């Protein structure tokens, strides 16, 4: 796809982008889920995802970390964190594995609207990496993004999603 070609061109121009870090997780009884993005505030991306983040954080089986590409906050961020999610800044260096807190799953709220999240997405920072529909198009990064979460409301019933997504598309 065109997005895959664009992302590979970025990787050729900036080889450190395609960093494959060894994903090590603690054998914890709680599944650690990280959410990376820039719109954990009053924004359409937060309206699509913040309720899900809040719901997961309220469950005993999950530990939730929000990685934030901005330093902006408002009442929506406070509401999202209200059930126990942890809030961390996104580090651009990608050099420290501890930045991602050894999450089991890393979910990108959107890609393509802020450089910081897109830079992270080029690297394998967690055993499973997912792109959510905050900006509903493929990442073009099949080597580092495993799944694209779509919706029956976004896709035609019998559409072959593998033609449009570099990732494995999953209907939510």
Predicted regions mapped to residue ranges:
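Alpha-helical solenoid repeat scaffolds of the TPR/TPR-like class and their adjacent stem/linker regions
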Residues: 1-171
